[in-house]
Amino acid sequence: MVTVRNTRKDVVTAAGRLFAEKGYHGTSMRDLGRELGLLGSSLYAHVESKQDLLVEVVEEGARLFQASADAALATEGSAASKLRQLIAGHVGVVVDNPDIVRTYLNEARMLDPEHRGRVIAARDGYEQAFRQVIALGSSDGSLRPDADPKLDSIFLLSILNAIERWYRPQGEVGVAELVDEVSEFALGALRP
């Protein structure tokens, strides 16, 4: 039996799940209504459009990643320690919010230009946290002096973003082990 849920949060959560599973174009408002136990037209009492839902899911992904970066940057310690915190925060967001993250990483390109621009700016701000920490590490001695903050951030975020494709909580690798392995891999490449 389908339980009828009708809060906006329920609608956005269901949209994130369906966008993650079927993609933006593969998800219809009818699919979403069925998921929520609503008639298609009833859905419009909660949202203006499917694009509106995509915006909410993707912007939530951006907020979650930025909050994890802000927390990491607020910690005490060397840049290497902050980088480990950035990695742990990213992994935590991916593991705790798989549907939002999958939609953020894979479906943001489906946003209209205005919203895409905002999300790109948010993504750039998040990436800047990694660049900032790597640059700090080059100057405080905890990371290689010749590290390239821009390229090394791209490399590291490529690894971190790929986790959503293969990681399964019920699999052989636990979250703590995943954080340790990615951190050691990254820091192994960046230590002096």
Show the residue positions of the predicted features.
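Hydrophobic/aromatic residues within well-ordered alpha-helical segments
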Residues: 50, 57, 61, 65, ...
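N-terminal intrinsically disordered/low-complexity leader segments
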Residues: 1-6, 17
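Hydrophobic alpha-helical connector segments
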Residues: 56, 70-100, 149, 153-156
